[in-house]
From Swiss-Prot:
Protein name as annotated: Dynein axonemal assembly factor 3 homolog
Organism name: Drosophila melanogaster (Fruit fly)
Gene: Dnaaf3
S-S pairs: none
Similarity remark: Belongs to the DNAAF3 family.
Null allele phenotype: Displays impaired motility of cilia/flagella. Adult males are infertile due to immotile sperm with flagella that lack dynein arms and display axoneme disruption. However, the testes appear normal in shape and contain elongating flagellar bundles of spermatids. Larvae fail to react to tone stimulus due to defective auditory/vibration mechanotransduction. RNAi-mediated knockdown in the sensory neurons of females results in uncoordinated locomotion during climbing.
UniProt xrefs under InterPro entries: DNAAF3 (IPR039304), DNAAF3_C (IPR028235), DUF4470 (IPR027974)
Function: Required for the assembly of axonemal inner and outer dynein arms. Involved in the cytoplasmic preassembly of dyneins into complexes before their transport into cilia. Essential for the development of axonemal dynein motors in the sensory cilium of mechanosensory chordotonal (Ch) neurons and sperm flagellum, and consequently, is required for the mechanotransduction process of hearing and sperm mobility.
Keywords, ordered alphabetically: Cilium biogenesis/degradation, Cytoplasm
Gene Ontology CC: one annotated term: cytosol
Top-rank lineage group of the source organism: Eukaryota
């Protein structure tokens, strides 16, 4: 609910790949690059509308924008973010603001660690807490003042939010402020959730944690997650740990269901994920294969280190629009190191006076607009509301939004469009439930007229997503066998009785071999002299 359980995608790249649109990488030479960009200017792919339903975090937005510079064809992107409540959308706005924070405020490593802290830790560093509060005040000005929004982040569009959702944004940003009455005892909420989930197994929870990781998540693509970081997250809610940091402040961006009660707030406590973790979005794979090295199941690098490396790449590309070269000395090999996990510190709320103000304009990303959509529109999309018809070129939907999927939903997709559905692969649910979910989803999309963008019948693998496309072209659906296999020389005649299985071998016919080949002809005579072949009957 508060983070996705699938890896970040470059949604534009997925679209190009699904429809086999040629988009050669831009050359490194500056003159050749300019010529290629001019040649791509007349391309008919001018605008793409992208809908992200229940993304829970801005991982797809960040990667899509970061990799935008690599494409020769760069259409205008309209990205629509639709989540279940205003607090999650406010959190997404904050995380997107961190990714696009002015470079004068933070260096690359500090920005990455700040993002990781706010993104995946229930208890955060004091510096992250200060940023959350100060940035919350800036975001509050943005959602209540159109001029301030255009000055700081003109790429954001909140016209799709109703006044109720804007009030929800205002309550979230206000709740983040360090006031004594804004209480969020996340450590207590976390323990309550864990006790309720495990029941009588709580006293032996370390064994339950190891089982979920070793027997489930690692078997489904989570090999990069180390047991120490996973157990510590399951115990405390702190996923990303570095030895030089101490965590003592509650991460109030995880609070949902805020309701005013005088100057105080009532909320639902912590209702997010407590089984998979925030490792999937950026921490499962990286382009540097050396970082996936492991010995007897012990990784050299943690999912935390992979997350750090990937975010440094994306944030560097967002800022410079150039390729990132990773400095190997920055990544610390803590995969097989047993870090001393000290108890979480107590925290004291303090006045907001004297904190830094993060009110500089965001990094400019030309040709991109991010629209925040009212959560109420999810029901309208399910019913096939006319104002959404033929709107989107790319749709991503989280697995927990599957109940909103219907045949009418696909009316919102254009004639040539891509649909990506997150699966339950990286949950700890039983294998049969994961397979049942995939089967139902495939059947629904097939009934709606969508065609698989990947040959799922031929590839017997584990799917983190299901990718289907809607196309107006008369294309043949991929089959399990893509090439016609040569026919057998032996054919059955439906009118012939071949007898019992033991006698079936008498129906074999040896083709006539030219007599010029004396060696083969001699072998043929020996085989015929031995009589018909019989199956072995002396089974143990």
């Amino acid at each position: 609910m508060l983070w996705g359980i699938s890896s970040a995608l470059d949604l534009y790249e997925e679209y190009l790949r699904a429809f086999k649109i040629k988009d050669d990488p831009l050359p490194e030479d500056e003159h050749a690059r300019e010529e290629a960009e001019e040649a791509a200017g007349d391309n008919t792919l001018n605008t793409l509308n992208i809908l992200i339903c229940g993304g829970a975090d801005p991982r797809h937005v960040i990667k899509t924008l970061a990799k935008r510079y690599t494409h020769r064809i760069r259409p205008k992107l309209n990205i629509y973010l639709l989540d279940g409540c205003a607090e999650i959308e406010a959190r997404n706005m904050l995380l997107l603001g961190v990714a696009l924070e002015d470079p004068e405020s933070f260096n690359l490593v500090s920005k990455v660690h700040l993002f990781m802290d706010l993104y995946g830790n229930a208890v955060i560093r004091p510096s992250s807490h200060h940023y959350m509060a100060a940035k919350g005040r800036t975001l509050l000005k943005m959602v209540t003042n159109e001029e301030e929004l255009q000055r700081l982040a003109p790429m954001l569009n909140i016209e799709g939010l109703k006044y109720k959702e804007r009030d929800g944004f205002e309550m979230a940003f206000t709740f983040w402020q360090p006031q004594p009455w804004n209480v969020f005892e996340v450590t207590a909420y976390w323990e309550q959730r864990s006790r309720a989930l495990l029941g009588t197994r709580y006293d032996h929870r370390n064994g339950a944690f190891d089982w979920d990781l070793s027997m489930t998540l690692k078997e489904r693509g989570g090999q990069q997650i180390c047991s120490q970081e996973y157990r510590y997250w399951r115990e405390t809610g702190v996923a990303f740990v570095f030895p030089e940091y101490e965590h003592c402040k509650p991460n109030k961006t995880l609070a949902v269901g805020l309701v005013r009660n005088g100057r105080n707030f009532i909320h639902r406590g912590y209702v997010g994920d407590i089984q998979t973790g925030p490792f999937c979005g950026f921490g499962l794979r990286t382009v540097e294969e050396r970082m996936h090295h492991s010995v007897h199941g012990d990784n050299d690098y943690r999912a935390t280190d992979i997350t750090e490396r990937n975010l440094m790449e994306f944030f560097h590309e967002l800022l410079t629009q150039t390729a990132y070269e990773h400095d190997t000395t920055r990544s610390r090999r803590y995969g097989s190191v047993q870090l001393l996990m000290t108890p979480l510190l107590n925290h004291q709320e303090e006045d907001a006076a004297g904190q830094a103000a993060y009110d500089k304009p965001w990094i400019h990303v030309p040709g991109v607009t991010v629209h925040f959509v009212s959560p109420m529109e999810m029901e309208q999309l399910k019913k096939g509301a006319a104002h959404w018809n033929n709107m989107f070129d790319i749709v991503f939907m989280a697995y927990n939004y599957y109940s909103f999927l219907s045949k009418d939903f696909f009316q919102a997709m254009r004639a040539q469009s891509l649909f990506i559905l997150e699966t339950k692969l990286m949950t700890v649910e039983r294998k049969d439930r994961v397979q049942e979910y995939e089967s139902k989803a495939k059947e629904l999309m097939k009934d709606a007229g969508l065609k698989a963008a990947i040959n799922y019948q031929a590839i017997n693998g584990k799917n983190m997503w299901l990718k289907y496309k809607k196309t107006d072209k008369d294309e043949q659906e991929d089959e399990a066998v893509t090439e016609a296999m040569p026919e057998s020389t032996f054919k059955y005649d439906t009118d012939t009785d071949y007898g019992e299985p033991a006698e079936e071998y008498t129906g074999l016919v040896i083709e006539e071999i030219p007599s010029s080949n004396q060696t083969v002809a001699a072998i043929k005579k020996e085989v015929e002299a031995e009589g018909p072949l019989q199956p072995k009957t002396n089974f143990p």
